[in-house]
Amino acid sequence: GELSPTLYYPVLGQEGSEKQAGDSVRFGFRVSMTDKGWYEAHKHAVYDIYGLGNSLALKHTTLPLYKRMEAIWDYILDDSLSFWRTAGYKGLTIGAQDYLGGVVEADRDAMKNSDIGASWMLASMTGDPRLTEERLPYMRNFKLMQQAPAGDPNHGAAMGQYYLWKKQKFVEEWGDHIEPIGITYYTLMDLGNILLFERDDSLLRSGFRAGAERLLSLQQADGGFAVAYGKHDGKPLFTDLKDLRPTFYGFVVAYKLLGERKYLDAAVRGADWFVRNAVDKGAFTGVCGDARFINDFA
């Protein structure tokens, strides 16, 4: 085969990128080659070139763990930092953070929750009534309402990461669809984290099981998944792409909490498929649901 490396320097907007006509540019580059596969090349770059293995020896932590926990605590309770908002939905008060980034149909009214487990953990550790009474009940309601209810064709799936309080609807960031990995993240992992602390919450457990069953129904015979499905017609979308994402992990969570063998078997099928199609090839698909699932930060 042929190699055709492409180099860009300087990067626009970064140091050294402002040039005048006639200026000269000097830069160096390194080419590393191996016949041992992408992972060995990756390790070489990480450890031999960038020296990541020495980072802990060079690190001097000055902020103790309890100070970090206090910072999270303050952040959650300070509305000016967390952009906390409550809103009505189907007779319930739901709570989340304002999200002012780009969301389809949003009019600066998108809300979402992140780090669900951290919030419940902090409340469990501190017993702070401001958390247990003023935050968690409304975050719980948000998670319950985010999920498609019984009777809906998408029952068990998260209907969108974001709630638009002006339109009173849940939406995805970009697109009118549901994603199997969205079930893993926003149903199984989020509800699973809450259930670690609220084991007797029957509504949450019922919603969790519905999510696990929905994910199971979407797994293909070879262990993989479609990237997304239309909300209204249930047809697979982005069929030119493979779901090269750890969607199968939702089954691991389901098995841990529900203890049923079918979820473990599904996790193994999914993991085997993921290794064959993603890990062995050094390939992945982005998880943000943006720009046709480009290789984003996730």
Predicted regions and their residues:
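Carbohydrate-recognition beta-sandwich/jelly-roll modules
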Residues: G1-E213
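Extended amphipathic alpha-helical coiled-coil/heptad-repeat regions
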Residues: F142-G286, F293-F297
